[in-house]
Amino acid sequence: MILRGVAQAYRKKGNHIITSKIEHHAILHTLQELEDKGLATVTYLDVDENGLVDPEAVRAAIRPETILVSIMTANNEVGTIEPIKEIGAVCREAGVLFHTDAVQAIGHIPMDVQDMNIDLLTLTAHKFHGPKGVGAVYIKKGVRVPAMITGGGQENKKRAGTENVPGIVGLAKALEIQTENLEANMKKMTALRDKLIAGVEERIPTVHLNGDRFKRLPNNVNFGIRYIESESILLMLDLKGIAASSGSACTSGSLDPSHVLLAMGISHEEANGSLRMTLSEFTTEEEIDYVLEVLPPIVQRLRDMSPIYPKGGVE
């Protein structure tokens, strides 16, 4: 709605949109469609080894015909939190609209659209324990976004169709609960996250933490485990009752390495050995201890069977 709507509403000014190479496919595929239809030209910004977008790279990419910059608040795979406030300030100075995909961030870290210079923001309920299939969009007053679904005047004439009232109320209530407990939840999840990271790095040799170690969501951990493929790890963890993934949920059926990790300069081999674990405020210390008990022998067993694992092991 936002990407297509802005492209349509501001086409007289231009058609140039700026984003990053590590965005969610909801952004990347929509922009690719706009490009294919000749409705937009898109600049895809590089990121550094931690997945961070440089605000100065955004500034350098802005042209007279630039109408929108879209950079996610935090990455869904590696948990890196982007310098959204600084990027928003660059956009504000240049007179360019700024959209952020805040799906991973809302309910997990503090956010303020005014302080962070955000014009457009999207979120979804299931990321903070709300109902699935329900989302919301913030549109700053004065920003033009035409309806992409027409036929009625619902939702301030932005999206036609009978409203899903239980879903809307469920989203609002879940966000209310999450916001009230945000500080305590962040403190708890950060402590558990750091314990998991330290424990894995201590117990498993040749493991790499993907994403920024400090500018990171409190509930995200992503490891690169060399010499084995993540699918094998996931199968064995599943047998032990541990839910994990190798990338985003939306690409769980694909065997291709993560576009996020590749954009961060990680090799295909290491990207194929990525392991993502997501915590919540309901995660317990006992569960972290269980993962630290189960994961190292699984990794060693798989490495012992791997033809690329060095004989004699690794330090």
Predicted features by range, described:
Residues 1-315:
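Pyridoxal 5′-phosphate
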